[in-house]
Amino acid sequence: MNTLFAVTLVFVGCCSNVVFLELLVRDFPGCGNIVTFAQFAFIALEGFIFETNFGRKKPQIPLSNYVIMVTMFFTVSVINNYALDFNIAMPLHMIFRSGSLIANMILGIIILKNRYSMSKYLSIVLVSVGIFICTIMSAKQVNVEKGGTEEDGVYAFMHWLLGIAMLTFALLMSARMGIFQETLYKKYGKHSKEALFYNHCLPLPGFLLLSTNIYNHAVLFSQSPPMEVPVIGLSMPVMWFYLLMNVITQYVCIRGVFILTTECASLTVTLVVTLRKFLSLIISILYFQNPFTAWHWVGTAVVFLGTLLYTEVLSSIPAAFKGYKVDKKAE
């Protein structure tokens, strides 16, 4: 029952979160900082009340270690959201971030000197090729759509290229953070709720560096058309409503993944999260009518095939089906 509940939270929370994020960035592409700040503040407040008992509970992992992790987490979160201001379409944003498993594996080989099976190396190639196809096709669209004059087209392309560089850096930084987190958990034990709180609480002063951008977007949000909130009946600017729903659904998504990790094997968690990403991509393409060519579909399919190959989901399906048939015969 808990597993079904967690899967529901993941699909409903994470998919709707992407919808509200896209509603925000379509009108204000540079609103990534205020979105990140709102998400961090909400999760930090919830953790302060329920995890640290209003600051009375001491951390199990030394704060000095959290400072290193938080610096990486803050950088990744800000860059990922800020990249949307560089002509990066939401579908490409999602596909690019699907390479996180592979980035983790590459850094694992370089830093931890890990060795993997041939199927894992094949998955690296597949995901890399898939992301490359989608990126090249998106580059062509940037040239076509933004190129009013040759100079405008070059500027738009360079702007987009900077966004791609930001996503690549964030992907590798996120993988490095994952390795660092793994070493901390081995040394001090798993304290995911605690890590979630400190990862969102400690970076809050860092948003002072982005305060001007956050304030400007808060003003713009307040000037958006009013709407009546369903059920409650209160009226509020539509962009503030989208931001509120984005924050709430982000929390539901995170909680769903957390429950899932305590109830299921890591393979199941990865499969659920991968399927969720694919569904989010479909929603983004169909509902928001984002440009998506046949080559984009090919690239997406290759990315997800590589991800499933990496997690050994494909090879485990026949074994699971065989076990199911044996159980049926025993009955």
Swiss-Prot record:
Record carries keyword Glycoprotein: no
InterPro entries: SCL35B1-4/HUT1
Membrane topology: Multi-pass membrane protein
Regions crossing the membrane: 5-25, 30-50, 59-79, 92-112, 122-142, 153-173, 201-221, 238-260, 267-289, 301-321
GO BP annotation list: UDP-N-acetylglucosamine transmembrane transport
Lineage of source species: Eukaryota, Metazoa, Chordata, Craniata, Vertebrata
Sections of the chain in a coiled coil: none
Protein name listed in UniProt: UDP-xylose and UDP-N-acetylglucosamine transporter
GO molecular function: UDP-N-acetylglucosamine transmembrane transporter activity; UDP-xylose transmembrane transporter activity
An annotated GO cellular component: Golgi membrane
Organism superkingdom: Eukaryota
Subcellular location(s) of the protein: Golgi apparatus membrane
Keywords: Golgi apparatus, Membrane, Sugar transport, Transmembrane, Transmembrane helix, Transport
Function in brief: Sugar transporter that specifically mediates the transport of UDP-xylose (UDP-Xyl) and UDP-N-acetylglucosamine (UDP-GlcNAc) from cytosol into Golgi.
Membership in a protein family: Belongs to the nucleotide-sugar transporter family. SLC35B subfamily.
